[in-house]
Amino acid sequence: MSRKVSISSLTLSEPMTKPARVQVNPEDIDDLDKTQQVNNHQYNIWYSKSLSDANNKSTTKSKYRVRISTDQGFTKANKNTHICLFFSRGCCYLGSKCQYFHRLPKESDNFKPTQDCFGRDKTANYRDDMDGVGSLNKVNCTLYVGGIHIKPNTEQLLVKNFQEFGTVEKVRVLQGKGCAFVTMKTENQAQFAKEAMQSQSLVEGSNEVLYVRWANEDKNPAAQKQEKKRQQELAYDTVKQLLEQESNKKPRLENGAVNRIETINIDDESEDEGAVEDDEADDDIEETRVNSLSAGVKKNVSTHQANGTPESSSTSDENDHNTILRNSLLKDISRLKKKMVYKREEPYLTNLLVDYSSDEDDD
């Protein structure tokens, strides 16, 4: 039976306005449960299991359970951080000091496609028992829930328990096998619900122990077609939401950008005018010095006098400015003349001495 249930009202106050609650006493947790959040613990490559997975026995009921209404709150996490794995299991002993988020996954979360919402790396294929992080080659929003004690209201109990962690899209109960399939709206919600409902029970105080796994792809063509349509609708809603967010931000950005560009252009024009004048002056000086060193003083003076007439000058200030530059250039040229005469004599004398010494050696 297909049923869509939205997330119920969890708390009257805003959840992120209060610090995250310490879920358990640190002294009550075993050493194996205090392993690091992601990829920093021992890993058995033969069984493809982490050391911390040793306590996750499907036959043992968990002593802890997350209560979103009371446990979630702000922590020391930044915007690029993942959700706390131990918070989803109800056994985080850090509370507001935790470096990860203590909240439900949001549709706006932009986690890496190669990782789950807890920051764990996905694998190419599912494990043989369909447990673990999941596959990076498939977006799976459906969970297999086993170990259920079938009751007349099992479907309602599943919806009640799983809707705390997201939007329940579909629930299908197999009465004769003691299992069910629960489809969440997004994969991140399914990842969180999988960890939160692992080794739990649908009714508080019951002896049942749920084991939650990833569901295999349904072989029914009608179910596959329905799942494909649901994924397309979800992608369409996501794109539509992103476009609406961009359209709301765009007018503000455009107005700010136009004002900024106008001010920058005004400043750039004034700076460019001054830079052009300085560059012209520097070019005149460099050309004068280079030409005077290569071709002689008189030729340079005549060249500057020929180029000294201002091209397309419009104001008297520019003419005065050019005249001052030419006078200063003439002074520099006169100084260079004396140096050039002195420097020309030294190489000449050196060459004579070198020639004389070489002749003596030949004799």
Curated annotation (Swiss-Prot):
Q: Which GO terms describe its molecular function?
A: pre-mRNA binding; U6 snRNA binding; zinc ion binding
Comp. bias intervals (Acidic residues): 265-286
Record's keyword annotation contains Cell cycle:
yes
- Record's keyword terms, sorted: Cell cycle, Metal-binding, mRNA processing, mRNA splicing, Nucleus, RNA-binding, Spliceosome, Zinc, Zinc-finger
Chief place where the protein resides: nucleus
Which InterPro entries does the record associate with it? Cwc2/Slt11 (IPR039171), Cwc2_RRM (IPR034181), Nucleotide-bd_a/b_plait_sf (IPR012677), RBD_domain_sf (IPR035979), RRM_dom (IPR000504), Torus (IPR032297), Znf_CCCH (IPR000571), Znf_CCCH_sf (IPR036855)
| Keyword Glycosyltransferase belongs to the record | no
This chain's protein is named Pre-mRNA-splicing factor CWC2
Taxonomic lineage from the root = Eukaryota, Fungi, Dikarya, Ascomycota, Saccharomycotina
Q: Which gene is annotated as encoding this protein in its UniProt record? A: CWC2
